[in-house]
Amino acid sequence: MSINNNNNNNNNNNDGLMISSNGALIEQQPSVVVKKPPAKDRHSKVDGRGRRIRMPIICAARVFQLTRELGHKSDGQTIEWLLRQAEPSIIAATGTGTTPASFSTASVSIRGATNSTSLDHKPTSLLGGTSPFILGKRVRADEDSNNSHNHSSVGKDETFTTTPAGFWAVPARPDFGQVWSFAGAPQEMFLQQQHHHQQPLFVHQQQQQQAAMGEASAARVGNYLPGHLNLLASLSGGSPGSDRREEDPR
């Protein structure tokens, strides 16, 4: 009987129960495991995280309005955006940036992108003065040097055709004396260019012919609009130069 009682006591002890000498059952209390407090204090403000910033009601209303206008998810994103925009002023006032380095690099890239887009929308007269632009891109320096070299080495005919006076149709024979133009440029400009690029004798002949045949040229044009190429008038009637040659005994 004693052996059985000892075995029963051992089984009871394994179950967490103790049997007293009187035969009463006593529940054994399990050992309580004490948890260690966390090493990191979650209530402390790490780098201002979770802080409530007090601001005037006007500023708070403006931040709330900007959050909706910019499509941000929270007011914190709007304040972060405002800090990025004001970073140059912050650096100018404090000497150092108050935002992390990652924000600084991002803001620099954002500012570079905004500057490039703003420059693209500006007119070319404000960007390069007289610098030529092709589809928003400036002509390279080597092309400029080649163009200047070509302009310096061209002959008289090319220099004459690059003038903005328009297209001139000059007869091959000087005795015809007809000068027709598409642009309707004044004849003084043409005579001045002829003075620089042709012989003085030919210029003198042109002046005499134009003075002598002023009325005949006006009558020959007829109903044609001035400033247009009137080849029909010069081909239909005899030229005053040919009339003068018939009358001249020479």
Curated annotation (Swiss-Prot):
Gene Ontology biological-process annotations: positive regulation of long-day photoperiodism, flowering; regulation of DNA-templated transcription
The organism's place on the tree of life at top rank: Eukaryota
GO cellular component: nucleus
Keyword Cytoplasm: no
Any one GO MF annotation of this record: DNA-binding transcription activator activity
InterPro entries: TF_TCP_subgr, Transcription_factor_TCP
Keywords: DNA-binding, Nucleus, Transcription, Transcription regulation
Domain called TCP: residue spans: 39-93
Places the protein is found: Nucleus
Major localization listed first in the record, in broad terms: nucleus
Record's protein name: Transcription factor TCP7
Pfam families assigned to the protein according to its UniProt record, in alphabetical order: TCP (PF03634)
Keyword Transcription regulation included in the entry's annotation: yes
